[in-house]
Amino acid sequence: MSDIEARVKKIIAEQLGVEEAQVTSEKAFVADLGADSLDTVELVMALEDEFGIEIPDEDAEKITTVQNAIDYANTHKKA
């Protein structure tokens, strides 16, 4: 597991109040991890803070799974 993947999974577990072991790449935030719309907004904000990035609304709407979040962080992270 890469450092970014581990950081993303830790943030998701903390934000959604689930065990980190439940946070696997194929899981969807809403369907599998019980997130609601406010949770997903807070999750995007936490990812922005952690990786020093800004996630536009149109991109945020596409981040619906753990793997989407990992891929986005890998692609857009600041050095």
From Swiss-Prot:
GO terms for biological process: lipid A biosynthetic process. This is Acyl carrier protein. Carrier of the growing fatty acid chain in fatty acid biosynthesis. 4'-phosphopantetheine is transferred from CoA to a specific serine of apo-ACP by AcpS. This modification is essential for activity because fatty acids are bound in thioester linkage to the sulfhydryl of the prosthetic group. InterPro entries: ACP, ACP-like_sf, PKS_PP-bd, PP-bd_ACP, Ppantetheine_attach_site. PROSITE patterns: CARRIER, PHOSPHOPANTETHEINE. Belongs to the acyl carrier protein (ACP) family. GO terms for molecular function: acyl binding; acyl carrier activity; phosphopantetheine binding. The lineage of its organism: Bacteria, Pseudomonadati, Pseudomonadota, Betaproteobacteria, Burkholderiales. It comes from Albidiferax ferrireducens (strain ATCC BAA-621 / DSM 15236 / T118) (Rhodoferax ferrireducens). GO terms for cellular component: cytosol; membrane. It is found in: Cytoplasm. Keywords: Cytoplasm, Fatty acid biosynthesis, Fatty acid metabolism, Lipid biosynthesis, Lipid metabolism, Phosphopantetheine, Phosphoprotein. Residues 2-77 form the Carrier domain. The modification O-(pantetheine 4'-phosphoryl)serine is found at residue 37. Its main location: cytoplasm. Pathway: Lipid metabolism; fatty acid biosynthesis.
